[in-house]
Amino acid sequence: SYMISKLNIKDNDIILEPSAGEGIFIDGIINQQKNIQIDALDIDEKAVNILKKKYWDMPNVKVRLTDTLLDRQLDMYADRQLWLKITDTLEDKELDYISDNGGYYDKIIGNPPYGAWQDYDKRKILKKKYKGQYVKETYTLFLYRCIFLLKKGGKLSFIIPDTFLFLNMHKSLREFLLKSTKIEEILIFPSNFFPGVNFGYSNLSIITLEKDDCESVKDNDVKIFTGFNTVRELGRIDENSENLQCFCYKQSDILKNENYKFIITDNSKIAIINDSKVRIGDVADVVTGFYSGNNKEFICVKSKEIKGAKNYRMVDCDKIYDCYDLTGIKNVAEGYVAYVKGSSDTRYIRKEDEWYVRWDKETVDFYIKDKKARFQNSKFYFKTGIAIPMVKSKQIKATLMRNRVFDQSIVGIFPKGKDKIYYMLALMNSNVI
């Protein structure tokens, strides 16, 4: 596969697959018939049992049931910087030797989990261990963790969502990547290239990098490829496909961007963005919305014809209420309110309400207490603002939002001056943006 070819695997390499799953990458590596050692880890007991049966006669493939993010054996392999975040004192001479040699693995490959729920107790542990990192997202922690496990000069290739490139919550990770690795290549492509995967709000990416903390990493050129139409094109970027675009940036230039964001456009537009004295956050509150914790249970659709409505229940029209109360609809056993979710076919005004969220008082009380639900930025629910779906599109379709709860996949823009609402709505829908 493309990812395996990017690692340039050699005899005697020690390789890690931190979320081995069915062993697809392992099979590809074994087919190269190299004299290598593979550590295959997974948190799922069923997957591990399958892997052990699959590779029972291969002593060079070691399968372990473990949580990669908290595994103590991997802690021993990580370089000194992460150890100091795990504990205050580490005096073991053998571990010092491993640390001084900069990690343990020559190559790391994987498709780490994303969006996995972390309970609050585990979050506390992860916050202590991975200081400064956003611990609610697993894939970024896997990336951060695995770079520490690489030897200097070791290579990593991961397939992960592309949100680490631009979301503010991943600022610290981007800085770490740009200062501690040479990023060779990033491919960005639709998530629906792979069966059963379709984020809607982001693309997938394949990142290939080499661990190197020298000052020279800042002079490294990062190549970013976009415009893929089919999954087959992922392995054919050298064939000069007409639809592919290649952007090349020095890591030092990306470090100059606000929050170290990967702004994927031509350099003249990057300069305009970086030189701007007024940002949208200066004139408006920009927030994401609500998550029920179990959308199939609490979210309904008006019609099965709506995009993304598969497996959702249709709403009972007799249970829809005009309620704008954060505490929920009172004196009803089951009630729903209009919900802003998904993309819009039109700009400025959505044609009709298509989604509904359960909002009776008992259910709202449940959301507030439930560990999986996110009753976030609730002071903006039912307010007047602008809704922009977090979907990849050639054209932004911003719509007016009044008296609605909005989904976490929606960016809500709430101008600090009420007289600016229509100006900003027009601006967001203009060709300038």
Where is each model-derived feature located?
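Signature of N6-adenine DNA methyltransferases within the class I
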Residues: 1-2, 6, 15, 19-36, ...
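A positively charged, amphipathic N-terminal helix/segment that binds anionic biomolecules
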Residues: 9
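Phosphate-coordination loops involved in phosphoryl transfer and adenosine-cofactor binding
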Residues: 12
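Generic solvent-exposed, charged/amphipathic alpha-helical segments
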Residues: 52, 174, 425-429
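Conserved hydrophobic residues forming the short capping helix/wall of the S-adenosyl-L-methionine
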Residues: 55
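Conserved beta-strand scaffold positions in the cores of enzyme catalytic domains, especially
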Residues: 63, 186, 339-340
